[in-house]
Amino acid sequence: MGSPRLAALLLSLPLLLIGLAVSARVACPCLRSWTSHCLLAYRVDKRFAGLQWGWFPLLVRKSKSPPKFEDYWRHRTPASFQRKLLGSPSLSEESHRISIPSSAISHRGQRTKRAQPSAAEGREHLPEAGSQKCGGPEFSFDLLPEVQAVRVTIPAGPKASVRLCYQWALECEDLSSPFDTQKIVSGGHTVDLPYEFLLPCMCIEASYLQEDTVRRKKCPFQSWPEAYGSDFWQSIRFTDYSQHNQMVMALTLRCPLKLEASLCWRQDPLTPCETLPNATAQESEGWYILENVDLHPQLCFKFSFENSSHVECPHQSGSLPSWTVSMDTQAQQLTLHFSSRTYATFSAAWSDPGLGPDTPMPPVYSISQTQGSVPVTLDLIIPFLRQENCILVWRSDVHFAWKHVLCPDVSHRHLGLLILALLALTALVGVVLVLLGRRLLPGSGRTRPVLLLHAADSEAQRRLVGALAELLRTALGGGRDVIVDLWEGTHVARIGPLPWLWAARERVAREQGTVLLLWNCAGPSTACSGDPQAASLRTLLCAAPRPLLLAYFSRLCAKGDIPRPLRALPRYRLLRDLPRLLRALDAQPATLASSWSHLGAKRCLKNRLEQCHLLELEAAKDDYQGSTNSPCGFSCL
């Protein structure tokens, strides 16, 4: 291989010959297939001084497939240079002359030859003089967006080949498969060409079927607003290369357009992305780079071209963010728990409600992660300011950072206070209800007393009455009070029998108690007796509160000895009817069961019953001896 200067000198000789042939319009069969590319290289050389090595393949490479040629060229040409070529006046002509060679393989190697049509085919496919003069077939088109197709109408005349393509710098690139087909249409007919995306660089190209014919190309969609809509952004492939503190997005375009990109943040997927000031990304060969950024899913790129824009948010592939923060509230302080996998400095401050929820107010609290890529948990303690304020958290070691707004949840504190208040109120209401129940409903709120009335005039009878009172108090249980004058002798002696009886009667009536009248017909007649206590008791029997129960000992009084007015009262024979008497005195079944089932209670009741039985025998014997000396009269024992 020679030096570059020698190669350039040798290759400049064919260029000189081609230029002379073209200027002199000398037909050169061996150079005819190079004509279009030589002119192209010549124009490029006029616009850009010098001819680089990357452009020499254009002079000798002749491919029938435009995508191959375009790929070959694009791999060797910067994108900025392609855009300049696209805007060149020499490349924006509506039509240019092409040569379609056919390859033939012989023993001498590969060479190109021109296929000559027969006379009939020549007359059929030969374009008219007017068409040749106009430079290719005239055609019209209609856009069918509902079916994503372009309807092309060829005028009357020979057959033509039509296709859709995306105009790049030096070549009109075929559409991607299956939209990259060329269709043959007869003169005076129409054909529908489907497309994938309606783009501003999409062109319609038509040519006759002969060699060395002219292709007519129309690129009408550059001024159509529809070409910059959703199809335009869907045709772009966005690739995210963001890492560390750098947001990087690579774009693969189908049209050689230069987009503008800026940083924006989106609070919610349904809300617009708000552009941040002074946050324009730098573009280089399709790469958009923004330095010193806190990578966050809500920080996005906003690409715009003309009046159209599109938002592309990196980090949407499900990868975990580089840092997270959580909050824990205590008595008078707030604890922020940071988890970070990168070097970073985090700051936090209370928000200022007067200036806005995103405006921090001093002081600012900061903490740093200095251990690199190892996951580290940091705790930042902040004193409480006011419960209605929110805390702002952000990365302070970068220029562009998204502020997290965290509002302390103090509802659990309010809920706890509310629960305590409700409990206190419930307890207070319960106490009030209990007090009212005891006052207004004494039967259900407290134990009802039993007033035991008797007229015992002997020592044996008094002992029997006392034993019966002890038996009733033990059997009733639950703190039931049995009122009997024998147990309140001092009080009776101080105030007198009658006032004591009236006070006991009022208490029983107030507390809804029961009066138990113990009757006896033995012994001396109380009616004839001068005992003032017995006379007072007989006088008050008619005024005794209800319910009034009558009980009698079988050995001291017979059933027939009860006066007729008292026979209407419930009567209980002691000690045989003691269980019935206890039920009548409103002894609870549970109390009875627990009392009788308990071993100590059984022994106590058994002793009380035996004592009452013995005292009944003793009183009956004593009364029998006394009855021989005085006539029998009715008595309230």
UniProtKB/Swiss-Prot annotation:
Q: Which GO terms describe its cellular component?
A: cytoplasm; extracellular region; plasma membrane
Task: State if Signal is listed as a keyword.
Answer: yes
Q: Which residues lie on this side of the membrane: Extracellular?
A: 24-414
Disulfide bond positions: none
Q: In which tissues is it expressed?
A: Predominantly expressed in mucosal tissues, including trachea, lung, kidney and stomach. Highly expressed in colon epithelial cells. Also expressed in testis. Low expression, if any, in heart, liver, spleen, or brain. Among CD4 T-helper cells, expressed at high levels in Th17 cells.
Q: What is known about what this protein does?
A: Specific functional receptor for IL17C, signaling through the NF-kappa-B and MAPK pathways. Requires TRAF3IP2 /ACT1 for signaling. Crucial regulator in innate immunity to bacterial pathogens, such as Citrobacter rodentium. Isoform 4 and isoform 5 may be either cytoplasmic inactive or dominant active forms. Isoform 2 and isoform 3 may act as soluble decoy receptors.
Q: What is this protein called?
A: Interleukin-17 receptor E
| Source organism of this protein record | Mus musculus
